[in-house]
Structures are given as structure tokens and as C-alpha cells.
Amino acid sequence: MLATWRRFFHPSGNDDASSPSSLYNEKCGELEINVTESSPPKATGAVKIEAVEAVGGRKGRYLLYIGLVLVMVIFELDNSTVGTYRNFATSDFKHLSVLATLNTAASIITAVSKPPIAKVSDVLGRAEAYIFTITCYILSYILCASSKTFNIYAGGYVFYSVGQAGTAILNSTVVSDISSMRWRGFVYNILYIPFLITPWVSAFIVDSVVNGIGWRWGIGMFAILMPFCASFIIVTLLVFERRAKRSSLILTEKLNLFTFCSRIDLGGIILLSGGFALVLIPITLAATTSDCWKTPWVVVLIVLGAIALACLYPYEKYFARHPVVPTHYFRTLSVMVSMALACVDNIGFGTTQTYLYVWSMVSHNFSPRNAQFLNYSNSVMQALVGMGTGLLMYRLRSYKWIGVVGAAIRMVGYGVMVRLRKNESSVAELFIVQLIQGAGSGMIETIVIVAAQISVSHAELAQVTSLILLGSFLGNGIGSAIAGAIYSNQLRDRLRLHLGHSADEATVVRLYNSITDTLPTWGTAERNAVNRAVCSPAFVCYLT
């Protein structure tokens, strides 16, 4: 039995590469990819992490994995609690109707922040980039926890989105730095083991916090927890970098402002990030308000964003010395298809998940804890299936057909969702929908990351990873905008229709903007009317 198990994980062929910088001629199915390392500047993050591995050896690698686990634990706990507190914060500020707008803006900011942070990590180093992102986290917690108005809370969420973007891209980059290509799909997903536990733990935390000390304290405690847990990997990286410098493995390089801007490709970052932001944020605002399309500045911003994106390719080809999007990416099918697939998959996710938490509390009378269970069962299943997909990729040395199976499961999930996500559905049926969707996404998300990464050199690892994650978060933002548009344009009229003449306009507005203190008692005629409004086909279509 043991011999059979060993043969499964050690198929014919050598897996002699322990890091991507030493792995060449990696075969995926019938496709052979020849990776040729370029010679990046000596102070790049890729060179620094290679020097850290050389100085630290096996012990250093284990310390980095421990640091990554600590960061992932607090990152996932934050992700599964602070994101939930957003529902209660917008309700307390009487702005529940703009929840989708806030989610979309956060997704867009998260998406467009990834390429510049990836570039900074390449120029300055992984540890220095971690310090920047954790600082953004701390500022966001302070602003959100102490906010007196919705605008201050939203401003804090901007910093939160930047911190989340940076931490996510750095975690993905570091784990790719220290793992081989064949094992990368598995190692990339195994870091999400904490996510198999944190949603269930966070459900009890959220339930206690919102019914006790309040969501502000729930956010504020991360201002201490996040830097404490992140300090391990930051200190580990800095200590080994210092040793590598003493051994002359890293050459100290002083950058002036012009050289720094050239290295991070400031012009390309402005065109890429600014272009997407100028296109998507106005579209989001226009979709979630009734008269926003009539404002001239919306069209102007969209046109400016489109022009910026159109200028990206010629700028990167003819002007950029260190392009944030190397032009050969546009001709690399595995990069472009992976980015498009990640975007499309997350459009579906954002559309069907944005108001799921609120919907379950209203239509099924879920407590905050049970709504949390439902909301994150999809992602937990995604993490589990992602690990299995990574092992399967190691065995088969191929990913194309796994991706096809994942897409098919995703489509089956949408079909099941149309049938089962209703007011009359049982709790088991609601969870079945989430699990099927998560299984499909687990395959797809693993495939797109690895397929893109094995097509580039180690020096471009952070860049290509940031672009795939950019596609993911852009898709999530677009999906949230779709959900928000339907919420804004449908729910108020549906509430008026089902509540009838017994409810005045003030009651309709309160139900539309908040769930924390305005829902009628469960089982009453008024509550049944609200449930029918929320679950009516014209409104719930975004969930299917």
C-alpha cells in the first residue's frame, strides 16, 4: 500500500528542481515549455529571494513556510470577519444599498494595486513590500473602527483594499519563489489550509462580536493581530537578506527617484491601473444609481480610461525600459487565456455572492453565524478541491483537461443554483449549491495561476501572478456591480409591490437601506411580504 502511494507521487521522470529558478524544460501534457532566465538587476526581489534561499538553506525555507502560514492564518481570519462586518457597518450607516458599490470599488482598487505592488517587490524586495502592505492594513483598521460617517469608513476601506491586494500578491509570489513548478499547484493551495478552519471559527467570532462588543471592536483588534503575525516572515526575510549582503550575494544598490520610477514602470502602472479604474468605477456608479448615466463626467472618465488602456501596449513596447506588462505576454496564450478565464469565473462569483449573506438572513432568518457558514462554504470547498487539483497536476503533468472539467462543474453549479436557491429551499439545498460552485472554482483558480507562471521566467513571476489576480478581482468587481445594479433598480419597487398600501415610503426606505434593526418579526405577514420581495424572480435573478 505504501509503495503504491509512493509511486503515485513519484511518477517516472525527475523532479530535481526545488525552485523555479533552476527548473527548465518543464513538460505539461504534450507541450514543452523552455524557460530561459533573463539577467535582472542585482537588487531585484527575485535575486534577493534566491540569495535568501542560498543563505538560509533548508532551515530558511522552513522558516519562510512558517511565516507564510502565520500570515495566511491572520489574512484569512481577517478576510472572513472584516468582510462580514461590512454588511453591518453599511446597515448602521443606513447605506446597505451601496454595499455592492463598496464591494466593487474595493475589488477594483485591490485589482489595480496588485501590479504596482508586485513591481515594488521586484525592485525593493519582498520584505519591504510586506512592510508597506501591513502599514496600509493598520491605517485601514484605525479609520474603519473609529469612523463616524460612511465616507470615513469608505476611505478606510481604500487602505484596506491596498493592504489586502499587497498581502495576497506577496503570499502568492513568495510561495512560488520557493516551490518547484510541478509542486506549485499543490503548495499554492496548501497555504489555504487555514481557510478550511477560519470561516467556521470566524462565524462564532462574528456572531459574538455583532451581538456584543460591536463590529468596530471586531475590526480594531486586527490593528494588533495583523502586524504581530506578519512580523515573523518580515523579520525572517530581512535577517537572511542581511546575511546575503554580507556574503556579497546581494549587491547594495542606491536608487534615485528617476531610476526607481523607471524600474517600477510608473508610466505603465498609471496606464494599466488608472485605465481600469477610470473605466470600471464610473460604470459601477452609473449601474447602481438611477440618473448617473446622465452625468457628463461618467462618459468622459470611461473614454479617458479606454484611451489609457489602448496606449498601454505601444508604451510598454516602445518606451518602457522595465515594462509592468511585458509585450510578449500579449502573444503568450497561456497568460492571456488564464487572465480572461480568471476574470469570467469571478464575474459569476461576484454576481452570485455579493448579497448572499444579506439574502440568507432575510429570506431564511439565518443568524450571523449561520449566514457566515453559508457564505464561506463555497470558498472552503474551493480550497479543498484546489489542493486535490494541485496533486493531480503533479501526477499528470498536465492541466488542460482538468480546467475543462472545472468549467463543466461550474456550469452545472449555475444550473443547480437556478433550481435550488429559493425561499422554499432547505438548508441542505443551499449548501449543496455552494459546494458544487466551489468545486468548479477550485479547479479553475489553480489552473490559471500555474498555467501563467510556468510560461515566464523567475524574474517575471511576481508580474504575471499580479496580472492573473488582477483579472480575478476585476471580474469580482464587475460581478458585484451587476448585483448592485439589480439591487438598486429592483428591490425598492418589489418592496412596494409586496408590502402594499400598509407600508409607507419611510418603511420601504428603511428596509432597503438596513437589515440590522428594521426587519419585521419572523413569521408575521409583513416579514413574509419582505421575504417574497427579496426572493421574487425579477430580483433574485442575479443570484442565478
Provide a role label for each language-model segment.
Residues 1-82, 91:
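Cytosolic juxtamembrane N-terminal segment immediately preceding the first transmembrane helix
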Residues 60-117, 167-168, 172, 202, ...:
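Extracytoplasmic
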Residues 67-69, 77, 84-85, 94, ...:
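Transmembrane core module of solute transporters
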Residues 113-126, 210, 385-401:
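Helix-to-loop junctions at the C-terminal end of transmembrane segments
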Residues 116-267:
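Helix-loop-helix hairpins in multi-pass membrane proteins, especially solute transporters
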Residues 146-157, 419-434, 488-494:
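Helix-loop junctions at membrane interfaces in 12-TM secondary transporters
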Residues 216-340:
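Hydrophobic transmembrane-helix bundles of small-molecule transporters
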Residues 255, 449-450, 471-544:
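Hydrophobic transmembrane architecture of multi-pass small-molecule transporters
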